[in-house]
Amino acid sequence: MKLTKLWLLFVCLGLFVTLVVSADTDSDADSDSSADSDSSADSDENTTASGSIVTSTTESSATNSSGSSDDASGSSSDVDDGSDDDTDSGSDTDYDTPTTAPVVKKRANRKKANNNKKRASNNRKKANNNNNNKKRANSNNNRKRRASNNNNKKKASNNNNRRRNNNSRRRG
């Protein structure tokens, strides 16, 4: 039940937003078209006692109060016309925002690069230490192998066998 109420709320909100957006564009279109048509112009015109026709100024003020005429004329301070000299007071922030963003990113990348370099050097050191430990262990093992091989060679040699046999004869 809660899901359906939530869904209904979103649908109503979406319809409301579309209605507001479409109503805003329709009011601009209606005000533009009413100035061109003769039937609506008659209702906006007032005749004076002398018979001259005076048009109402509410039509022009309504079209100028909407944001569309300012954007079309280019007199807004947020729009940059591409000229070298900038006399707009509010456009300084437009130039500051793109230049500050890459600086922050570069610092973050430098930190990441430094961290990666540190990690790589630490990994190299650890690998070298592991290799050194392996070398030490292997050298110890090699010494033991050599010693055991030497002992085995002595046992296998004829001199050693003769000595052993003589000693065993003497003992009895």
Curated annotation (Swiss-Prot):
Residues 1-22 form the signal peptide. Sequence repeats lie at residues 27-32, 33-38, 39-44. Low expression in first to third instar larvae salivary glands. Residues 104-172 have a biased composition (Basic residues). Residues 25-172 are annotated as: Disordered. Residues 27-44 are annotated as: 3 X 6 AA tandem repeats of S-S-A-D-S-D. Keywords: Repeat, Signal. It comes from the Eukaryota. Residues 25-45, 78-95 have a biased composition (Acidic residues). Residues 55-77 have a biased composition (Low complexity). Coiled coil: none annotated. This is Pre-intermoult gene 1 protein. It comes from Drosophila melanogaster (Fruit fly). The lineage of its organism: Eukaryota, Metazoa, Ecdysozoa, Arthropoda, Hexapoda.
